[in-house]
């Protein structure tokens, strides 16, 4: 058990960093100090008390990265309720499912997202609040939440007649063993799994960040990864807030142009990112330089190449704000070309490894200790083993145990049993090896999950289940080709024949329409690039499961 209490980390931080800047929404003038964040949390606690919210009740949050997203999260966990973050690009039906499956009482959401949700599909909610200003967007019949919110100033004066000061912060010290977070691994109805994360799991990640001094008091960080994603949440937000860092929240799509401008203005001391983002920056900032004829010539001259690499390194560091200690990349495999070039120019980057079920960190090494090809070193609060006769040389499933490992999947005992070994180790589903020093080398992924370039988990069966319900699709199989999803489809030729539609032109029209409709039903990171027709039924196991490994290398038509 981690000795530091997760809730007390934030009580202490608010008191110690009272006047320091805490959260700023990028592009806006308003900044919340740590003291102001604590006061906003106190207001939400009064709301919860007024509504007789119980410890252990669930509260969902969905929206872009904003100060109030962070405040709603911290208000929930410091009250003793369980927070349920939802990725903002999930489809409405998936949001409905998660809110209902988690049995959420309240929902904090962006106004535009709320407009696309259906009230009747969320009948279990007592109230919905805006992440713009915390006003009540909806209340269930018989509730008086809106009236209370309008009189919040009076409630604060009544409870804090002398004003709200750091001495008023006194959160109940909830046991680290308590579940504080439900993080859903997927948004699709029927397949989503709510990962039960305890205070101990969260404290394990945050205190690791504190011990290794990833961030310090008074430093700056730019939060652009989705806060509903375990990686960005743990370090850009939770660790940063625990140590007194100033967090600027980028509530926009992190295109290279927007990021470059934000990095220049914020000048972060640490950058947490995924391969897709850093590869785009490489493509936009570095490739135009090194592809010049004069540059290619110069890089082939001994001694001169080192000088040029140093200049390129400086240009890249300056483009990212110029003040960061290192760039930590996680969530997916890096493009080898980019990795090799970064090593050549001695760029301060490292690659970590984790998963939602570990909240998320499993392995990490600072950039000056990082071994190329590895995914970092197993944390000192975790253990790793490889399900292999020779874990140093023969690939096997990576299995872990330790402080960061989840309690299980919410209301899904079967999935929980399947993901743990009989002796209690978490089966990551990743294949790899380790070395004598505890560095992990990931060789691939087991089963069927595909990891998108921005770190999102893609479950092919979920997309296939939607596609298989579309006109004239008998079977389908989602594969990855050149980092894009392709759907192999065996058409229902019998039905096409019976309707006199079995011509290449008609089949193309039908499948084009299916592709268009399919991409409306899945998340942005699950978009299918094309449908490729397959001439026969797919080969199956005795259990009638498709033998996926036979089709992963199917080439383009």
Mark where each language-model region is.
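Conserved C-terminal "lid"/linker of ANL adenylate-forming enzymes
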Residues: 450, 475-486, 513-557
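AMP-dependent adenylate-forming
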Residues: 9-33, 530
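Conserved AMP-binding/adenylate-forming core of the ANL superfamily
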Residues: 22-66, 70, 74, 91-96, ...
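Conserved AMP-binding A3 loop
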Residues: 33-35, 171, 180-206
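Structural core segment of the AMP-binding/adenylate-forming
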Residues: 51, 78-157, 483
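Conserved AMP-binding/adenylation subdomain of ANL enzymes
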Residues: 203-220, 227-314, 323, 348
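Conserved pre-ATP/AMP-binding loop-to-beta segment of ANL
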Residues: 18-19, 149-184, 191, 214-220
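Conserved ATP-binding/catalytic segment of the ANL
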Residues: 385, 392-452
């Amino acid at each position: 058990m981690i000795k530091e209490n997760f809730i007390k980390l934030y009580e202490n931080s608010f008191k110690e960093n009272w006047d320091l800047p805490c959260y700023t929404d990028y592009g806006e003038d308003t900044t919340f100090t740590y003291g102001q964040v604590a006061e906003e949390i106190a207001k939400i606690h009064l709301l919860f008390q007024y509504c007789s919210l119980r410890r252990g009740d669930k509260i969902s949050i969905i929206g872009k990265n904003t100060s109030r997203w962070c405040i709603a999260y911290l208000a929930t966990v410091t009250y003793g309720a369980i927070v349920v973050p939802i990725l903002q690009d999930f489809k409405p039906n998936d949001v409905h499912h998660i809110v209902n499956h988690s049995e959420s009482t309240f929902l904090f959401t962006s106004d535009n997202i709320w407009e696309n949700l259906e009230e009747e599909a969320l009948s279990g909610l007592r109230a919905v609040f805006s992440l713009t200003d915390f006003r009540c967007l909806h209340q269930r019949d018989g509730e008086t939440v809106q009236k209370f919110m309008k009189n919040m100033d009076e409630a604060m004066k009544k409870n804090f007649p002398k004003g709200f000061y750091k001495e008023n912060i006194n959160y109940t010290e909830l046991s680290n063993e308590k579940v504080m977070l439900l993080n859903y691994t997927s948004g699709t109805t029927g397949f989503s799994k709510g990962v039960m994360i305890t205070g101990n799991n969260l404290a394990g990640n945050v205190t690791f960040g504190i011990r290794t001094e990833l961030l310090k008091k008074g430093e700056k960080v730019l939060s652009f990864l989705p806060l509903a994603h375990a990686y960005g949440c743990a370090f850009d937000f939770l660790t940063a807030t625990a140590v007194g860092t100033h967090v600027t929240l980028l509530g926009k799509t992190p295109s290279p142009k927007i990021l470059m401008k934000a990095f220049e203005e914020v000048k972060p001391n640490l950058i947490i990112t995924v391969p897709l983002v850093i590869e785009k920056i490489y493509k936009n900032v570095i490739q135009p330089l090194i592809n010049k004829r004069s540059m290619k010539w110069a890089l082939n001259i001994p001694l001169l190449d080192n000088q040029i690499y140093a200049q390129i390194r400086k240009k890249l560091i300056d483009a990212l704000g110029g003040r960061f200690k290192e760039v930590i990349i996680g969530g997916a495999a890096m493009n080898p070309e980019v990795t090799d070039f970064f090593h050549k120019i001695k760029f301060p980057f490292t690659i970590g490894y984790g998963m939602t079920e570990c909240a998320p960190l499993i392995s990490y090494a600072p950039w000056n200790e990082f071994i190329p090809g590895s995914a970092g070193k197993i944390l000192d609060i975790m253990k790793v083993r490889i399900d292999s006769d020779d874990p140093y040389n023969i690939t096997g499933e990576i299995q872990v145990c330790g402080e960061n490992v989840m309690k299980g999947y919410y209301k899904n005992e079967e999935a929980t049993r399947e993901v743990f070994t009989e002796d209690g180790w978490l089966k990551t589903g990743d294949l790899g090896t380790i070395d004598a020093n505890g560095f992990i080398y990931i060789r691939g992924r087991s089963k069927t999950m595909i990891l998108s370039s921005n770190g999102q988990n893609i479950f092919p069966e979920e997309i296939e289940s939607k596609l298989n319900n579309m006109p004239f699709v008998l079977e389908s199989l989602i594969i990855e080709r050149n980092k894009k999803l392709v759907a192999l489809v065996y058409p229902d030729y019998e039905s096409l024949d019976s309707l006199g539609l079995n011509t290449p032109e008609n089949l193309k029209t039908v499948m084009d329409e299916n592709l268009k409709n399919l991409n409306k039903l899945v998340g942005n990171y699950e978009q299918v690039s094309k449908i490729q027709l397959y001439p026969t039924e797919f080969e199956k196991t005795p259990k009638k499961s498709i033998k996926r490994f036979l089709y992963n290398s199917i080439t383009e038509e």
